[in-house]
């Protein structure tokens, strides 16, 4: 079946077969023969072909047929049925898993039938006889495909009639998920060699013309047995391999060592069990080395135990991650020892002796590239991220569950990773862990030492402080391109850039053209309100806080619930009285670090946020945002009960207590309760007699700041300052307070906004209504 038949014998057996091929091939154009790739180059192109979505299945099949014709030359060496069979098996091996899954359970006979199935075209049952697919799965081969011994280089190969199967008698093709079990094949007597086993791979290769298979050592004795020699043919092959290695698609991790063994890429390959070791004959391969190198000489039989092969490389002899496996030959003619396998990364070309080393290299050097379909990956069920190791996935899951198993025994602070705890413990140690060899300055972290050594390397002046230690100069490593602010660390710059991104996202909501860029920067979108976030944790917190109102973290002391575990931890410091954050200038202590940061701004005069309308400056961006609402009149916070709007959410929460009647703040002396803490503070001054607001001119003190401001008007020197310009538009009467003017306007309008709920009588002032209600109270007593 695989040997080259003698034309006379073939004409006697099948008179029309050879004539059909001759009619189809015809006279070949010499220019086309020169332009087509050489057989070994076409072989590499055929094996390394990858399926592309833009080409489609029909164009991919046509390209494979063209490459296989250049490689196998079916008019000279093989039957058309064998050519179609090789094309079919390679076509199935390059199909992606989601396309290959559509062919499960379908009896495939040729490549055209596969294309019709993928394109949805009804199949023609009488198209052609089925082709044998038993040896193309990479696990077993027909019994007649064996290595044969070459008697003489000049001998014309003969063909045995028993080895050829007519096309109409070839057994039917089994479905992909019902591959037939391998059958042991007897070894036949040696015949003139035309197919043999290549020592460098398990790829089946077709026989080439005699001049191509000539031993390179015979033509040039100085050259070694390597197939990449310094000649024109090898230079052409090396150029093709280099382009395939570094200019291929980003989806390919490495070349498979045995593309025929596509069974390792099947989704249902777990069902293929090996019950007992069976001896099979592997597909033999035509190599590019000398024809005189026979497996029998090296003492290697052509049969191999299935159990041994699958335990090392998987089904079909393919590595687990599909990386390229080659055997490196030296310059000498000595036989290569077994086990010298090299795994090559097709992105950078680095060689590794073991597969685990290659996988670790790809995880570290190429982390952003998508893994090979057959490589192991661990996916997070929360956000969908994939990881190469289960330990990394376990650490990532703690960001969703907020689990912090590592606790500090000194301050009870908890961390997700043990490395973070180790860095934290250095802050409690008085002895520095790292010291500078030049100035003997100590540091708790290696990064601080490296920054200090960088200052030494740049030749900066390190002035000693009074304690004898050198002071590291301030180094601004990164600069914000938007506002010009500098940061020491790149992580701080990334957090700062999010503030600019928020402003861009707000502007992009008004510009529909920039919606796509906003979705790329914020991939996690809330299904309720459409708000987008950069991280899944932010989306989870937003859903709990705004939509579901879920508060899974509760305080065991007071029962108060929180949406985040960090809020619960900071709240528990209120019960313990712990205030770990102290101001270095006034020694005032705070429970939270954010409170200390806000307090530190009060000591400085820096107010970087300015109002564009009135020029007023603020220390924080949120204060400026609240102030701008005074100019625009925007009141985004509205009450669901009465519809009244407020500029701040805190004002809305305080207003809602009027509807609910909640008074959470109680006086510990008289028990009187108040809605706001400020009212409680003013009430306590009535018990203590405290008057914190004093006049700097006369020394008179007041309980409220408003009373002090009213009193200061009496000390102003000019009459214009005494008379506040609040005049009545009806009668021209002036008032020093706006509330008095509003009360006076009720006289002109006749409005009585305060009505009694019992008798319906209305009043212009609230004090009059309260006085009227007392009459009803007296009536109820009698």
Curated annotation (Swiss-Prot):
Residues 302-313 have a biased composition (Polar residues). A zinc finger (C2H2-type) spans 292-315, 321-343, 349-371, 377-399, 421-443, 467-489, 495-517, 523-545, 551-573, 579-601, 607-629, 635-657, 669-691, 697-719. The keyword Transcription applies. Residues 510-521 have a biased composition (Low complexity). Residues 11-20, 28-37, 500-509 have a biased composition (Basic and acidic residues). GO terms for cellular component: nucleus. The modification N5-methylglutamine is found at residue 485. Induction: Transcriptionally regulated by POU5F1/OCT4 and SOX2. Keywords: Activator, DNA-binding, Metal-binding, Methylation, Nucleus, Phosphoprotein, Repeat, Repressor, Transcription, Transcription regulation, Zinc, Zinc-finger. GO terms for biological process: negative regulation of DNA-templated transcription; stem cell differentiation. The modification Phosphoserine is found at residues 160, 206. SUPFAM superfamilies: beta-beta-alpha zinc fingers (SSF57667), Retrovirus capsid dimerization domain-like (SSF47353). It holds the Pfam family zf-C2H2. Residues 1-71 form the SCAN box domain. Interacts with POU5F1/OCT4 and SOX2. This is Zinc finger and SCAN domain-containing protein 10. The gene is Zscan10.
